[in-house]
Amino acid sequence: MYTREELMEIVSERVKKCTACPLHLNRTNVVVGEGNLDTRIVFVGEGPGEEEDKTGRPFVGRAGMLLTELLRESGIRREDVYICNVVKCRPPNNRTPTPEEQAACGHFLLAQIEIINPDVIVALGATALSFFVDGKKVSITKVRGNPIDWLGGKKVIPTFHPSYLLRNRSNELRRIVLEDIEKAKSFIKKEG
């Protein structure tokens, strides 16, 4: 019987060897994810940016700093949650990953979620949301904050990606994302 840590290490090693799509050709590092494997809440973004590609860590650039700040404002310590992305290699020029690239990485994300087995997943942005609704085009603006029933009784809470907040600085958008994080917290099952 493997521990969660051992299982996640197996996933990580497989991601490092992956050549299933062209994104592997230009990566500096794969960005598998990081955080608490015993968490009840997982945050999923789109894909690594330049800083993430350099460091091999998710959400460490400007959007990551904002995510950490939003978590703190919600009473969540970053080290208490798990943070990852749909794709594990940086798309060139930080473009949106193609459906083919997302599909090539999808089984890795599914494995991560299966290992952690959270109660709730926060989908950060339209690309992450698309993964949880089988690739359908859904407007994040229309569905954000509304829980989506997903595999194994998990709830997915869509919200805006922190990079969207950086591009559209607004106290109202910030308030909305904080509200969505609070809603996600409400789906965490109490132990015992």
Swiss-Prot record:
Alphabetized SMART domains for the sequence: UDG, UreE_C
UniProt: [4Fe-4S] cluster binding residues: 18, 21, 89, 105
Catalytic activity: Hydrolyzes single-stranded DNA or mismatched double-stranded DNA and polynucleotides, releasing free uracil
Keyword DNA damage in record: yes
UniProt entry keywords in alphabetical sequence: 4Fe-4S, DNA damage, DNA repair, Hydrolase, Iron, Iron-sulfur, Metal-binding
Gene Ontology terms describing biological process: DNA repair
Thermal dependence summary for this entry: Remains fully active after heating 15 minutes at 85 degrees Celsius. Completely inactive after 15 minutes of pre-incubation at 95 degrees Celsius.
Domain description: The seven N-terminal amino acids are important for maintaining proper protein folding and increase temperature stability of the protein.
Function: Removes uracil bases that are present in DNA as a result of either deamination of cytosine or misincorporation of dUMP instead of dTMP. Can remove uracil from double-stranded DNA containing either a U/G or U/A base pair as well as from single-stranded DNA.
Protein name: Type-4 uracil-DNA glycosylase
Organism: Thermotoga maritima (strain ATCC 43589 / DSM 3109 / JCM 10099 / NBRC 100826 / MSB8)
